[in-house]
Regions:
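C-terminal motif of bacterial Sec signal peptides marking the signal peptidase cleavage site
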Residues: 18-22
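Bacterial N-terminal signal peptides that target proteins for export
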Residues: 1-10
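Subset-of-secretome marker
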Residues: 24-332
């Protein structure tokens, strides 16, 4: 339980770096830069990253795992694609290639990716998934009731990131990103204490805004669960746990540097997690986006379009669920 709580704080802080509502001038300037890139008619992107996990056993032994990943992508208005590969230098893990396409509100991912992920833990892919004859599975986010078009349009507004942050954390949340601005370069440097404090504020704000999140994103959370999460986040026990979490993350650093020009954007992200009684997790990632000319995207033709609910049923181990032809759109 202690480890789960620690990792929850880590992930919340990392995600908050990209989505938090802010009010400082540096944050507002950063939001303006993001909105400018969102207005590009077309964007070519690339990602290169390296994840290293070192787990220390109670007997002094160490288990190491490294995963390298790289991706290329292209976006033009509401259409995009990305091709992502994963490499294990030690050859222990065989993570499948991810090929994803987005056409408006529908996102398609290659079926072989889902099958390969299922086999990583030694299990066979769900029968319902294997029974699909099409090569790509598309999930229609519009069917969930979430206005994806509205969310995308929001990001083109000068204060789009700030407004999106308010949507997640609430309009009265006392949150801001600790940006240091130097011209068009924005850096963030967090240690263990700053990481935990930032994550704690974000978790509390999110919990107190769950009613709005539940309705906006159609999460389907029952009222009882929302009440329980609000109570937990605002309890004295929550605040009392923070010093212990800070101590367990002593030595941790999270750093990011983002640079904007009129025609491109680059980001360097480094996360060095030092977790007491566990080990280390180090993630480095470099991202580049370049303003590009508009070109057509060739979408896969062997596709099956389903709702999120139908997809969830397909992924249940041992299920033999099939999708009725009348509930989806198939092209081949």
């Amino acid at each position: 339980m202690k480890m789960k709580k620690t990792l929850a704080f880590i992930m919340t802080a990392a995600l908050t770096v990209g989505t938090m509502a802010g009010c400082s001038q540096a944050t507002l300037n950063y939001a303006q830069e993001l909105s400018n890139t969102a207005k590009w008619e077309a964007t070519t992107s690339s990602i290169d990253g390296d994840l290293n996990i070192n787990v220390k056993g109670k007997d002094g032994t160490e288990t190491k795992q490294e995963i390298k990943f790289a991706a290329t992508g292209y976006t033009a208005k509401d259409k995009s694609y990305v091709d992502m590969t994963f490499t294990d230098p030690a050859g222990k893990l065989n993570i499948p290639e991810l090929k994803a396409y987005c056409d408006g509100t529908t996102s398609y991912i290659n079926k072989s990716f889902y099958q390969g992920i299922s086999s990583l833990n030694g299990q066979s892919a769900p029968t319902g998934l294997n029974n699909i004859t099409q090569e790509y599975i598309g999930i229609d986010t519009e069917a969930s009731g979430v206005d994806v078009t509205k969310l995308k349009a929001l990001m083109t507004q000068p204060d789009g990131m700030v407004e999106f942050g308010k949507m997640i954390f609430g309009g009265n949340a006392d949150l801001d990103l600790p940006f240091v601005q130097n011209g068009r370069e924005y850096t963030i440097n967090l240690d263990a204490d700053k990481t935990v404090d930032l994550a704690a504020k974000a978790l509390k704000a999110t919990a107190n805004n769950l009613d709005n999140l539940n309705s906006t994103f159609k999460l389907g959370l029952p009222a009882e669960s929302i009440t329980q999460m609000k109570t937990a986040a605002n309890s004295p026990e929550f605040d009392k746990s923070l010093p212990e979490i800070k101590a367990s993350l002593a030595g941790t650093t999270i750093n990011s540097k983002e640079v904007f020009t009129d025609n491109d954007y680059s980001s360097d992200f480094n996360m060095n997690l030092q977790i007491k009684d566990f080990g280390t997790i180090v993630l480095t990632m470099k991202t580049t986006d370049t303003k590009s000319d508009v070109k057509g995207i060739t979408f896969p033709t062997s596709t099956l379009k389903v709702s999120q609910e139908e997809f969830n049923k397909l992924m249940i181990p041992g299920t033999k669920t099939t999708i009725a032809p009348s509930t989806n759109v198939v092209s081949k």
